[in-house]
Amino acid sequence: QLAGDDKEKGIIVTSTTTGEGKTFIASNLAMSLALLEKKTIMVGLDIRKPRMAELFSIGDRQHGITNILANEECNWEEVKAQIVASGVNHNLDLLTAGPTPANPGELMVRKSLKQTIALLKEHYDYVIIDTAPVGLVADTLQLSKLADRTLFVCRADFSTKSSFTYINKLDEQKKLPNISIVINDIDLSKKKFAYSYGFGKYSKNGNRSFGFYGLFSNNTNDDSIKI
């Protein structure tokens, strides 16, 4: 569905809190689009606790978007200089978080961030943005006007039902664009009927750390999501 909509180029991937698997989901979405021959870039905007470079086994932690956001404005050559190849598919590039700044909140409201995302949309079919958990910091809400769609990641047997109240509130108030929910880490042995896909950790040597994500059922007295 995403690959067929040329107007929805910028996609935020977020969650309520840490540990729900948003970076895994973002990386799998980016890789899936790349395999469909879509020129894709994944952007690491969880700049307080970045995991993207580790996930793709990128040893260079000096390049990244924080170098761009250190300035108020930017151009394509400056953005391009911070982009690295993913090493797993020729259609997938990465703009990792880069060095951790002392003022992450300030960087998220700079004009250079808006310019960076706009430039990436000009040069790529899809821009997948891995953000900070929206329930912990307000950074992600600053991106609402820069993206076209939001994938909100929850984790089975981990995320609470109150997360859905929060997501509904964000949707009603138009805090994030076009929210869709992804349920991550489903145990298929516990559910007779499941709609799921595999995902894994990407590296130059192949995939590992496999799990599942898909639809959910919340018919339970427990506060966590039961699948």
Predicted regions and their residues:
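P-loop NTP-binding module
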Residues: 1-227
